Amino acid sequence: MALIKVLTGVRRCGKSILLEQIKEEFIENGFDRAHIITINFEDLQFEKIRTAEKLNSYVNEQIKDHDKYLIFLDEIQHVRSFEKVLASFRATLNCSIFITGSNSKLLSGKMATLLVGRCVEFRIMPFSFAESYEYATAIGRNMSPDEFMIDYINWGGFPLRF
């Protein structure tokens, strides 16, 4: 049984973007798209999936065989008792689970207790000044380091700014 991969970090730091990049990496390496289940709980399409039971039903309806599945759950904190269904998926399905969500809810008391030893946390941080400058230069935003420092002080290292 694989550990649940938990991406945490402040709002807008790039967790959802990173989750999508991880999924794309699997696809580029030949993982079957039909065996990837992706749910963004901030998408109205999934508005009715707000309980562990409904999430369990939805995911199990998507599974068609015993091959390995990848399950990507973005903003999982919108699902009540999500920690129970994650533990169930991990115990009963041939899958690898990746989740994102609010720092304050993902690894708080109840989830931490139910999933202790079953998950690994990856703390996602906004870009540092050096990372922001390197990326800005790579995409053609030519500024001197001093000019960019003013920009960085105003906007920070959040990926959306690019």
Residue ranges and their predicted role:
Residues 1-162:
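Phosphate-binding site recognition
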